[in-house]
């Protein structure tokens, strides 16, 4: 999860988030090199008094600054396209969870079970227990098995919402009348926090998301106790 004065991204918990982190570093390095070159050229222009008065054209330079940006854009586009396809790919999910956005809470339905559904509201500040996080805790967590592909079906009952969990690399719009899907695969157990990431009204800031990833055996015990 995020912490005060954090400079980097949240720790990656899913393969997709690991890919996104690597792509961020790859792109940032390219931007850093380009920025350094531009600053170097600007410093040369400000410090030198020499002027090429006889230079009317420079075909070699024009060729370089046409081809080089194209190569750089390709170096950015290819990894980006790969990640886009990976994010859309869903192979044999073991579980499907339907998520509905409301003003201002989330409801969840485990479609593989006959009667396993619940609403998830933010825990008020005056009801928090020691060690719990303000504006991030909920009364009912989404419990899921770790290391297994899980399909999330996301929609909304009223206005636009966005279901986002940064450490899993997830952000999917919840749109009324439309069903979007995303894949979750957690590499490790833990509790992961997210929030609604689309301004949806006066209580937009009070729609937290809490995922609890546990081993499959513990998930089976939990689902049995909930039915």
UniProtKB/Swiss-Prot annotation:
Cu cation A2 binds at residues 196, 198, 200, 204. Signal peptide: none annotated. Its cofactor is Cu cation. The chain crosses the membrane at residues 15-45, 60-87. Its main location: mitochondrion. Mg(2+) binds at residue 198. Residues 1-14, 88-227 are mitochondrial intermembrane. Binds a dinuclear copper A center per subunit. Keywords: Copper, Electron transport, Magnesium, Membrane, Metal-binding, Mitochondrion, Mitochondrion inner membrane, Respiratory chain, Translocase, Transmembrane, Transmembrane helix, Transport. GO terms for molecular function: copper ion binding; cytochrome-c oxidase activity. Its EC number is 7.1.1.9. It comes from the Eukaryota. Cu cation A1 binds at residues 161, 196, 200, 207. It is found in: Mitochondrion inner membrane. InterPro entries: CcO_II, CcO_II-like_C, CcO_II_C, Copper_CuA, Cupredoxin, Cyt_c_oxidase_su2, Cyt_c_oxidase_su2_TM_dom, Cyt_c_oxidase_su2_TM_sf. Residues 46-59 are mitochondrial matrix. It catalyses: 4 Fe(II)-[cytochrome c] + O2 + 8 H(+)(in) = 4 Fe(III)-[cytochrome c] + 2 H2O + 4 H(+)(out). It is an enzyme of class 7 (translocase). GO terms for biological process: ATP synthesis coupled electron transport. It is a multi-pass membrane protein. GO terms for cellular component: mitochondrial inner membrane; respiratory chain complex IV. Component of the cytochrome c oxidase, the last enzyme in the mitochondrial electron transport chain which drives oxidative phosphorylation. The respiratory chain contains 3 multisubunit complexes succinate dehydrogenase (complex II, CII), ubiquinol-cytochrome c oxidoreductase (cytochrome b-c1 complex, complex III, CIII) and cytochrome c oxidase (complex IV, CIV), that cooperate to transfer electrons derived from NADH and succinate to molecular oxygen, creating an electrochemical gradient over the inner membrane that drives transmembrane transport and the ATP synthase. Belongs to the cytochrome c oxidase subunit 2 family. Component of the cytochrome c oxidase (complex IV, CIV), a multisubunit enzyme composed of 14 subunits. The complex is composed of a catalytic core of 3 subunits MT-CO1, MT-CO2 and MT-CO3, encoded in the mitochondrial DNA, and 11 supernumerary subunits COX4I, COX5A, COX5B, COX6A, COX6B, COX6C, COX7A, COX7B, COX7C, COX8 and NDUFA4, which are encoded in the nuclear genome. This is Cytochrome c oxidase subunit 2. It comes from Gerbillurus vallinus (Brush-tailed hairy-footed gerbil). The gene is MT-CO2.
């Amino acid at each position: 999860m995020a912490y005060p004065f954090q400079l980097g991204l949240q720790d990656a918990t899913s393969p997709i988030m690991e890919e996104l982190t690597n792509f961020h570093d790859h792109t940032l390095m390219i931007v850093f090199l380009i920025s350094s070159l531009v600053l170097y050229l600007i410093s040369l222009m400000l410090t030198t008094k020499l002027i090429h008065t006889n230079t009317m054209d420079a075909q070699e330079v024009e060729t370089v600054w046409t081809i080089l940006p194209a190569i750089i854009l390709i170096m950015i586009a290819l990894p980006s396209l790969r990640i886009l396809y990976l994010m859309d790919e869903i192979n044999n999910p073991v579980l499907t969870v339907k998520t509905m956005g409301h003003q201002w809470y989330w409801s969840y339905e485990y479609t593989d079970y006959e009667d396993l559904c619940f609403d998830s509201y933010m825990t008020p500040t005056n009801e928090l227990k020691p060690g719990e996080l303000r504006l991030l805790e909920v009364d009912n967590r989404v419990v899921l098995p770790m290391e297994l592909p899980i399909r999330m079906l996301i929609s909304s009952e009223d206005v636009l919402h966005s279901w986002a969990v940064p450490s899993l690399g997830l952000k999917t719009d919840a749109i009324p009348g439309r069903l979007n899907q995303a894949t979750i695969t957690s590499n490790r157990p833990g509790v992961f926090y997210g929030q609604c990431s689309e301004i949806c009204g006066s209580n937009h800031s009070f729609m937290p998301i809490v995922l609890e990833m546990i081993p499959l055996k513990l998930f089976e015990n939990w689902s049995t106790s909930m039915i």
